[in-house]
UniProtKB/Swiss-Prot annotation:
The gene is HA. GO terms for cellular component: host cell plasma membrane; membrane; viral envelope; virion membrane. In natural infection, inactive HA is matured into HA1 and HA2 outside the cell by one or more trypsin-like, arginine-specific endoprotease secreted by the bronchial epithelial cells. One identified protease that may be involved in this process is secreted in lungs by club cells. Palmitoylated. It comes from the Viruses. Transmembrane segments: none annotated. This is Hemagglutinin. It comes from Influenza B virus (strain B/Finland/24/1985). Its main location: virion.
Length: 347
């Protein structure tokens, strides 16, 4: 008797494409690809995954948390992976913000990209004695604090001239913003300015003309000129009653580097700053996070890796993910197909 290996006959051959012989019939294959179905997003196995910046801050958007809105302040858990669930973050209280004038919408997503995020325990500037003062720190009834009194964002101080002696127009003033974070962290410093109609500008600041503002840090300089009256509606902020508007921006200060802000009337001086370190991988997705998954995929949500490759929609993914391929892949685990002997004789 003779045993021949490598070729056999079968009634159910499979076709595989090979690099050297093109299409070849074989007796058995193992599928290497899967086509996922869309599912909910999940926590990434083996690591901490961040959904909302502050999970315990109820009724707060991520921008509320990033700006330090009263009643929206809490611990931001560390995370190696983060879900970008608000593509266009907005705030829903405190003061109408002219979102599209600056990069303020990007602030929550900037923070989300860090593994460790904390708010400083003390203020970076003494707002009451800053150049152009003395000032009182303005508050808003639409921004209640924890005792339901008038409040404002923890990251900024609304610097209103304290008395008639300094409630006048001023040439540009400059304040240095020191670096107060530690442990090699980046410092994210939030600042801004307030403007109103001409009547309110004179009442608050003694000057009804547009005001100029400049920030500079880490080689990046930004200039603004305030708008006086004629503001757009702020429907996305819930129709807040204030006649004025604020513009909010931020600057990133690297370890040990001082920043500067040059301003006129209506400045929102930086107060508490964000100290952030490490990197968190960010992917677009949705909440809530349900269960765990090997992989987070922007189009399919949470995936468990059942095969090494996948077909379907190609998109960003993080974790232990299958590799995208255009067409299904198969591994031949059988022998090369040989037609039955009877068929060979008929030829």
């Amino acid at each position: 008797d003779r045993i021949c290996t490598g070729i056999t006959s079968s009634n159910s051959p499979h076709v595989v494409k090979t690099a050297t012989q093109g299409e070849v019939n074989v007796t058995g294959v193992i599928p290497l690809t899967t086509t996922p179905t869309k599912s909910h997003f999940a926590n990434l196995k083996g690591t901490k995954t961040r959904g909302k910046l502050c999970p315990k801050c109820l009724n707060c958007t991520d921008l509320d948390v990033a700006l330090g809105r009263p009643k929206c302040m809490g611990t931001i858990p560390s995370a190696k992976a983060s879900i970008l669930h608000e593509v266009k973050p907005v705030t829903s209280g405190c003061f109408p913000i002219m979102h599209d004038r600056t990069k303020x919408r990007q602030l929550p997503n900037l923070l989300r990209g860090y593994e460790n995020i904390r708010l400083s325990t003390h203020n970076v500037i003494n707002a009451e004695t800053a150049p152009g003062g003395p000032y009182i720190v303005g508050t808003s009834g639409s921004c209640p604090n924890v005792t339901n009194g008038n409040g404002f964002f923890a990251t900024m101080a609304w610097a209103v001239p304290k008395n008639n002696n300094n409630k006048t127009a001023t040439n540009p003033l400059t304040v240095e913003v020191p670096f107060i974070c530690t442990k090699g962290e980046d410092q994210i410093t939030v600042w801004g300015f307030h403007s109103d109609d001409e009547t309110q500008m004179v009442k608050l600041y003694g000057d009804s003309k547009p005001q100029k503002f400049t920030s500079s840090a880490n080689g990046v300089t930004t200039h603004y000129v305030s708008q006086i009256g004629g503001f757009p509606n702020q429907a996305e902020d819930g129709g807040l009653p204030q006649s004025g508007r604020i513009v909010v921006d931020y600057m990133v200060q690297k370890s040990g580097k001082t920043g500067t802000i040059t301003y006129q009337r209506g400045i929102l001086l930086p107060q508490k700053v964000w100290c952030a370190s490490g990197r968190s991988k960010v992917i677009k997705g949705s909440l809530p996070l349900i269960g765990e998954a090997d992989c987070l995929h922007e189009k399919y949500g949470g995936l468990n890796k059942s095969k090494p490759y996948y077909t379907g929609e190609h998109a960003k993914a993080i974790g232990n993910c299958p590799i995208w391929v255009k067409t299904p892949l198969k591994l031949a685990n059988g022998t090369k197909y040989r037609p039955p002997a009877k068929l060979l004789k008929e030829r």
